[in-house]
A protein has these predicted regions:
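Short, glycine-/small- and polar/acidic-enriched structural segments
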Residues: 26-167, 174-177, 181-187, 199-204, ...
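Periplasmic-binding protein-like
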Residues: 36, 107-117, 196-226, 230, ...
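Secondary-structure end/capping motifs
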Residues: 225-303
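Solvent-exposed, polar/charged alpha-helical surfaces in well-ordered, non-transmembrane soluble domains
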Residues: 52-53, 74, 78, 102, ...
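Pocket-lining segment of extracytoplasmic ligand-binding domains
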Residues: 88-89, 168-259
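Conserved C-terminal helix/tail region of periplasmic/extracytoplasmic solute-binding proteins
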Residues: 292-326
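Bacterial N-terminal signal peptides
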Residues: 8-21
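N-terminal secretory signal peptides that target proteins for export/translocation
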Residues: 1-6
Length: 326
């Protein structure tokens, strides 16, 4: 697990970047710093690429740093990190403003969240006046939950108070403590909520519209000036992605190790999450269009943003051709 650091504030990113300097000098590997927002199966491709040596095969020494989504976006734009995994957060920022960044790969085509409450909440309608905890305001977890609450007949802006609740495991603890009343949990945490704590699950975002939650986003400057570097990163992640699809047991072992859960929980997490992942690091044109149209409605935009403003899958397509990924 060398190279994985969990940090809470942006200043710690710089500390994490410096940790591997000695190893870098000894092994002649080029550093890549990638952020991710929450401990869950959604970032499994990063765990696999790290654990199974795919980053090193590309001559990369990966520091994978946990920070809140909006902090990751700020760090990307300032050049403190090379890439971010939580593309949903930066997509929402790009839909509303002009940011010099591009989403270059897409690993998830559906959100991986299950709405969870204590057992006394019989339906989502009972949450009126209650508190929902999320990782990032305006991020994938937040907006996916908003859509499900709307379907249940609530007006989230008026009926629900939204607070920052930490990452998914922290949200479970807040839910158990009564600090929040609703959490949107990903595997394996949702399995622990169901089996260990007997909490109530109200529905899944897997049944919702396409939602491009995780992938890889880089600055336009990095993509323009260091395209080969970006390609090496995508090649490592694509090998990890292929490993995910072809090796259930190995993927579950990686999850169990990184997320500190028992192997049966990791196996169920894999099987629950598998349908949400793309086959080749690409979202289809239809999935992108549906996603942007739904986002425009939730964000109250006049019209959907053009896909070309946000996505550039050209390097991922080159990698897919090289690796024979369909």
């Amino acid at each position: 697990m060398s190279g994985f650091h969990i940090v809470r504030i942006s200043s710690a990113i710089l500390l994490a970047i410096g940790i591997s300097s000695a190893a870098l000098a000894q092994q002649s590997l080029e550093r890549i710093v990638i952020t991710y927002p929450s401990r869950s199966i959604a970032s499994v491709d990063l765990y696999i690429a790290q654990d199974r040596g795919f980053f090193r095969q590309e001559g990369l020494l990966a520091d994978v740093v946990q920070v809140r989504g909006n902090i990751g976006v700020t760090a990307l734009l300032s050049g403190d990190v090379h890439a971010i995994n939580n593309v949903g957060t930066i997509i929402r920022a790009m839909e509303r403003t002009d940011l010099p960044a591009k989403v270059v790969s897409q690993s998830l085509k559906k959100n991986l969240f299950w709405l969870v409450t204590k057992p006394d909440v019989k339906s989502l309608r009972d949450l009126k006046g209650k508190v929902f905890g999320t990782t990032t305001l305006g991020g994938s977890q937040h907006l996916a939950t908003v859509r499900l609450l709307q379907k249940a007949g609530l007006v989230p802006d008026k009926d629900i108070t939204v607070v920052i609740g930490g990452d998914v495991p922290a949200q479970l603890q807040s839910l158990l403590a009564g600090a929040i009343h609703l959490a949107a949990l990903s595997p394996p945490t949702v399995i622990l909520a169901r089996d260990k704590f007997k909490l109530k699950i109200h529905g899944s975002t897997l049944d919702d519209l396409p939602n491009l939650q995780n992938g890889l986003a880089v600055s336009e400057k990095l993509l323009r000036e260091r395209r080969d570097f970006v390609k090496r990163v995508l090649r490592a992640r694509s090998r990890a992605h292929r490993y995910f699809w072809e090796n259930e047991r190995g993927t579950a072992e990686v999850l169990a190790n990184y997320l500190k859960v028992e192997l049966p929980v990791a196996l169920e997490s894999y099987r629950l999450a598998r349908p949400a992942f793309t086959a080749n690091g690409l979202a289809t044109d239809q999935e992108v269009e549906e996603f942007l149209r739904a986002d425009a409605e939730v964000l109250k935009l006049k019209e959907p943003v053009h896909a070309a403003k946000i996505f550039d899958f050209s390097v991922q397509r080159e990698v897919n051709q090289e690796l024979g990924l369909k």
